[in-house]
Amino acid sequence: MMKALVVVALLVTLISYSSSEGIDDLEADELLSLMANEQTRKECIPKHHECTSNKHGCCRGNFFKYKCQCTTVVTQDGEQTERCFCGTPPHHKAAELVVGFGKKIFG
């Protein structure tokens, strides 16, 4: 009977040790993932900033990702250049307005 208790205690100890290592590995993976996401957030282009060289790098807004919106600018020399900035498209603004209005009504 005593040998059985010792074996069971040993098995419980081994299982808890191996599961704690697995949890530590999961926590480390989760931490690395969060750090990568934070790095991505730092590298994204904020609203109203220029995105001419990186048209897919705009940050996320409250509900949607900002879109790179481009316009043609004519310089004083008469040259046409394309300038882009991160902004909220009109249909996204309308959706945000409706959601905000709905939140005020329904709380």
Swiss-Prot record:
Disulfide bonds: C44-C59, C51-C68, C58-C86, C70-C84
Matches recorded under InterPro entries: Spider_toxin_CSTX_knottin, Spider_toxin_CSTX_Knottin_CS
One Pfam match: Toxin_35
PROSITE patterns: SPIDER_CSTX
Predominant place of localization: secreted
A GO CC annotation given for this chain: extracellular region
Propeptide: 21-41
GO MF terms, alphabetically ordered: toxin activity
Domain of life: Eukaryota
Tissue-specificity statement: Expressed by the venom gland.
Entry keywords, A to Z: Disulfide bond, Knottin, Secreted, Signal, Toxin
Subcellular location: Secreted
Residues making up the signal peptide according to the UniProt record: 1-20
Domain notes: The presence of a 'disulfide through disulfide knot' structurally defines this protein as a knottin.
Family: Belongs to the neurotoxin 19 (CSTX) family. 04 (U1-Lctx) subfamily.
Entry protein name: U1-lycotoxin-Ls1b
Organism of derivation: Lycosa singoriensis
